[in-house]
């Protein structure tokens, strides 16, 4: 890890495995981003997004846009790449002694809907955990939009049977995403569909840079919660699924380093712990390890190992939490 004595300049290009690892004494909760569920539906291009929304209109699903991942009665997702969310992370941390909860909220719901669904699930999950204390305390680790859900929950949902000790966000658009700006602009000017109802889920509007200015004003941090954050940046090859989104974000943000969807500046919230070097928006949930071999075979290239071991990255996060007494 390179540190230029400024938090904003911390570049993480490798992760050292802790010499003596001790898991946090309180459970870790993983909160997914846009799409999400137990599988991530990756949207690599605006074309696929257009096709997806068009299909939802045909199936009269506009008001419940992809809110139920369980429904696989047709092939409306065939043009999308589906991968498991948090690949291998839960099992790895459990093997190290961590208590881990993975959550599932409406993939394309609003921040408010997702936060309420997250709370409802946590209310149930904590009852399953044995504890000497009557009231459970949790450490939240969130990717992308999941971090906004968590901030809303902490700020606005009070009647809980659990406490939040910490929130660690990874590539969360705390100040919005220029890619969301682009998508909203595109569909507001897309006359070809000509439908009277709003076809773009509200979550896309909530992820814009303009909306997040409002969100941040009305969603203050809790003094009882410790906030940590990480960002990612990379420069894509032509075949990377984030190549076009990266260019859009780069141009609209006037040259800000980004991970293909979120700039480093937007990722910063609370104590900024550093920027993962050469990582795109999905590398941080370990998806590359799953697909890298097949991807390399497709392009007849040699598999290249990642500079940052993602499993060790999460091990370091949880080790840091444990050392802080969480």
Curated annotation (Swiss-Prot):
Swiss-Prot/TrEMBL keywords: Hydrolase, Lipid degradation, Lipid metabolism, Mitochondrion
InterPro entries: AB_hydrolase_fold
pH influence on activity: Optimum pH is 8.0.
Residue intervals passing through the bilayer: none
Enzyme class per UniProt: hydrolase
GO cellular component, one term: mitochondrion
Assembly and binders: Interacts with MIA40; forms mixed disulfide intermediates with MIA40.
UniProt protein name: Triacylglycerol lipase 2
Organism of origin: Saccharomyces cerevisiae (strain ATCC 204508 / S288c)
């Amino acid at each position: 890890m390179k540190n230029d004595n400024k938090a904003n300049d911390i570049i993480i290009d490798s992760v050292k495995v802790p010499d003596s690892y001790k898991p946090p004494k309180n459970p870790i909760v993983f909160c997914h981003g846009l799409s999400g569920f137990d599988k991530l539906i990756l949207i690599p291009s605006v074309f696929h997004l257009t096709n997806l929304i068009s299909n939802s209109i045909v199936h009269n699903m506009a008001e419940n846009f992809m809110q139920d991942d369980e429904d696989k009665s047709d092939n409306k997702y065939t043009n999308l790449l589906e991968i498991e969310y948090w690949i291998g992370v839960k099992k790895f941390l459990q093997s190290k002694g961590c208590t881990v909860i993975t959550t599932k909220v409406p993939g394309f719901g609003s921040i408010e809907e997702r936060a309420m669904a997250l709370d409802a699930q946590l209310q149930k999950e904590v009852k399953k955990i044995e504890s000497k204390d009557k009231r459970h305390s949790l450490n939240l680790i969130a990717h992308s939009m999941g971090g906004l859900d968590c901030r809303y929950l902490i700020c606005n949902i009070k009647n809980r049977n659990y406490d939040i000790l910490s929130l660690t966000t990874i590539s969360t658009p705390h100040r919005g995403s220029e890619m969301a700006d682009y998508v909203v602009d595109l569909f507001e000017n897309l006359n070809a569909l000509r439908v009277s109802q709003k076809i773009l889920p509200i979550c896309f509007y909530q992820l814009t840079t303009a909306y997040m200015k409002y969100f941040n004003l009305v969603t203050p941090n809790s003094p009882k919660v410790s906030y940590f954050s990480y960002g990612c940046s990379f420069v894509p090859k032509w075949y990377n699924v984030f190549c076009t989104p990266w260019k859009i974000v780069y141009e609209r943000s006037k040259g800000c380093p980004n991970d293909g969807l979120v700039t480093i500046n937007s990722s910063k919230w609370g104590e900024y712990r550093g920027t993962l070097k050469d990582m795109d928006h999905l590398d941080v949930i370990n998806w590359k390890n799953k697909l890298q071999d097949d991807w390399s075979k497709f392009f007849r290239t040699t598999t290249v190992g990642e500079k940052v071991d993602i499993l060790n990255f999460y091990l370091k996060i949880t080790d840091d939490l444990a050392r802080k007494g969480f």
